[in-house]
Amino acid sequence: MIITSLLDTDLYKFTMMQVVLHHFPAANVEYRFRCRTPGVDLVPYIDEIRDEVRGLCSLRFTDVELDYLRRMRFIKSDFVDFLALFHLNEKYISITPSPKGNGEIDIVIEGPWLHTILFEIPVLAIVNEVYFRNTQREPDYREGRERLREKIKLLGAKPEFADCKIADYGTRRRFSKVWHEEVALTLRDGLGPQFAGTSNVFYAMKHELTPLGTMAHEYLQACQALGPRLRDSQTYGFEMWAKEYRGDLGIALSDVYGMDAFLNDFDMYFCKLFDGARHDSGDPFEWGERMLRHYEANRCDPRTKVLVFSDALDIPKVMQLYERFRNRCKLAFGVGTNLTNDLGYVPLQIVIKMVRCNGQPVAKLSDSPGKSMCDDRAYLAYLRQVFGIAQPADDDASQ
């Protein structure tokens, strides 16, 4: 079985799930799977994927896992008590061949948000591992280890990068569970203090690494349906987050509606309240410069704020960003696919995104054309109008 622990997921799933329990326990949602890599035939592996998901749905949290979560300063005891009773229910997920053909599959997750939020990351990891164990039956781990050594060598070679730290954000698109663990341990041993930790809660617990993460796009997307007014949905999301965490976990995600809309909503109050912001689409250098100017315009010292970069990073790009912004602010870098799925094979660009909440469409309007995802064109057009966002010529968000 690929997934053997419900902790084998990203930390932000638990931080968001706690908000859902306390503030939105009645919300119902729908998620859909999408493979952005052309020419990939996943249909032959549907039965294997279903078997693995069935195994996932048989898991429960152990006492050791619950005790680990309980020790986190921002996790509340009633949430841990809820998790003690929790398991994923197979009735909320369907996996079928897509009517589009071309080897595509449809994965639809639909049900109470509280009971479906933990599907996304392990299901993506399952799809990845099932695909690669069938297409690469003798993985070239030697090549993977050599590439990983070169990355560690590159980052650790120059003294001026001694304070440049990276984190593992690679659970969802990892080559395999075994390889992911080896990568995390190799980074820990090879980088020392330059390895900040991992988003994966299971490996953080098992190997005493720092678990990392705050919020994901789905949280702010759901607020489109849960908030009092669509135009105020991003502000509402940040306010509800602050209500739950009271200044903890203070990294705001900036690209659900694009950078312009984010800066309009991220006023002086939020600039001072939140520790920083995370970049996940668009030009990271331009984004960073705009964030620093925005902090200064709102009477915040940028040197006290954290800029988190997590969009398709590799080590050279991390180093370029570090050189640009060091000593101007605090920095954090989350590297995903380039760490956990770089053995010489083309990684799958797969996502599972929320598309509906309480029966109404929700959407992400990314700063990167092609990363948006919505199955309702009329709603997407309305959302762009409400937030004053022009439609990129090459962005087909419904695909």
Swiss-Prot record:
Protein origin, superkingdom: Bacteria
GO molecular function: nicotinate phosphoribosyltransferase activity
Modification comment: Transiently phosphorylated on a His residue during the reaction cycle. Phosphorylation strongly increases the affinity for substrates and increases the rate of nicotinate D-ribonucleotide production. Dephosphorylation regenerates the low-affinity form of the enzyme, leading to product release.
Keyword Ligase assigned: yes
Pfam families: NAPRTase, NAPRTase_N
One of the GO BP terms on file: NAD biosynthetic process via the salvage pathway
UniProt keywords, alphabetically: Ligase, Phosphoprotein, Pyridine nucleotide biosynthesis
Catalytic activity: nicotinate + 5-phospho-alpha-D-ribose 1-diphosphate + ATP + H2O = nicotinate beta-D-ribonucleotide + ADP + phosphate + diphosphate
Pathway connected to this protein: Cofactor biosynthesis; NAD(+) biosynthesis; nicotinate D-ribonucleotide from nicotinate: step 1/1
Modified residues (Phosphohistidine): H217
Enzyme type, top EC level: ligase
Function of the protein: Catalyzes the synthesis of beta-nicotinate D-ribonucleotide from nicotinate and 5-phospho-D-ribose 1-phosphate at the expense of ATP.
Family indicated by similarity: Belongs to the NAPRTase family.
Protein name: Nicotinate phosphoribosyltransferase
Gene: pncB
